[in-house]
Amino acid sequence: MPPAYISTMSKLSKNYLNKINKILNKILEEEDKKITECAKLIRDSYKKGGQLYIFGTGHSRLLGEEAFHRAGGFAAACPIRDDNLTFKKGAKKATSLERTPNIAKKALSKYKITNNDILMIVSNSGVNHAPVEAAMIAKQKKIK
């Protein structure tokens, strides 16, 4: 590679990392209290025998998969798995289904989630039907 190309890539990499660090610092400043509160809820639930369930659709479900069964990770993490909310049957189908009423209810009903557990809901937009419905179900059942 020509030296000019490497120099440009180096500048782009540094610029990218600087922007990421700014975003992470902003999150730390603005959300630290909330993150700490959530961590305490998860810890307290775990101490009482509770589990951390993670619900998401599309790419958002990957956080649950990532947390599940990791060496050295949190053993009580359980992803909510439902093939209808993955891309297994195609992106168009999954996108359509995540906007279908009762889809979250159907997915959550496969698990014995109690008000001693934590339900983490992951959503890119926060507006699709499935994650909103999951939050409403959690609120109704007094699940944190």
Predicted regions and their residues:
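Short amphipathic alpha-helical segments enriched in leucine
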Residues: 21, 25-28, 43, 47, ...
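Glycine-rich phosphate-binding loops that contact phosphosugars or nucleotide phosphates
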Residues: 47-144
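Catalytic cores of large soluble enzymes that bind and process phosphate-bearing ligands
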Residues: 12, 27-30, 34, 59, ...
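A short, well-structured juxtamembrane/interface segment
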Residues: 30-47, 107
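Generic N-terminal amphipathic, Lys/Arg-enriched alpha-helix
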Residues: 8-30
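N-terminal amphipathic/basic-hydrophobic helices that include classical n-h-c signal peptides
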Residues: 1-8
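Short, glycine-rich nucleotide/cofactor-binding loops
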Residues: 24-34, 119-128
